[in-house]
Amino acid sequence: MTTTVAVTGAAGGLGEAIARAFADDGATVALGGRDRDAIEALADELGGVALRTDVRDEFEVERLLEEASRAGEESGVDVVVPCAAVFHGDPGNAPLDETAYSAFDDTMRTNLRGVFAAVREAVPHMDETGRVLIPTGSVAREAKAGFGAYAVSKAAAEGAMRQFAADCEQAVGCVDPGTVDTALHGLGGRDPSEAADLFTWAASVPEELDGEILGLKDWKQATR
């Protein structure tokens, strides 16, 4: 049976790399993103499906997960990775006390509410073997000056993960790939394709994943 994986934020960066990694492992991928042309081109390349999705709109997220549930050999969704995220301002130079209300609201609506919507809409299409992999970062747990609303949103997303894990029969956890070289922050870091391998591994260890945060150290210890 082919695994069906839904990824938001798949138009580029880490989301695209995660979609590619799962497709390389034989999964059927359902791709959501705001850049319609980018996700449709990627879906054509990977043999998956794509739907223009703004995670701030729960109805668009609902449609993506419904499409994903019909994309594979069997109905349903096996894995969801809510990767869509935004960062308003310059990382390291975006203090919370200077953050505009509009920027704070958009960050939380995308990085927290978008995660909530993706998981909430995925669960009805999952059986008890389903897995939810929520990307996170160290700023969620270790305060760093200048990361403002982004850090707050990631901390809140980790809190949402723990509650979903307590409430749902599926394995729900966070994956921390460290700093990844994407356009989101422009800080350099690990190649997205390397970081994506951490997600495919995390999907294979649901007992270790559920309610936890899996990072590079866990992956390297398990795969060395």
What are the residue ranges of the model-derived segments?
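Amphipathic alpha-helical dimer-interface segment in Rossmann-like NAD(P)H-dependent oxidoreductases
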Residues: 66-73, 109-130
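Catalytic Tyr-X3-Lys loop
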Residues: 97-116, 157
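Conserved mid-core segment of classical short-chain dehydrogenase/reductases
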Residues: 86-102, 146
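The beta1-alpha1 cofactor-binding region of Rossmann-like NAD(H)/NADP(H)-dependent oxidoreductases
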Residues: 37, 51-66
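Conserved glycine-rich Rossmann-like NAD(P)H-binding loop of the short-chain dehydrogenase/reductase
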Residues: 25-41
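Conserved glycine-rich cofactor-binding loop
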Residues: 11-12
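Catalytic loop of short-chain dehydrogenase/reductase
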Residues: 128-156, 161-166
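C-terminal helical subdomain
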Residues: 170, 174-175, 186-224
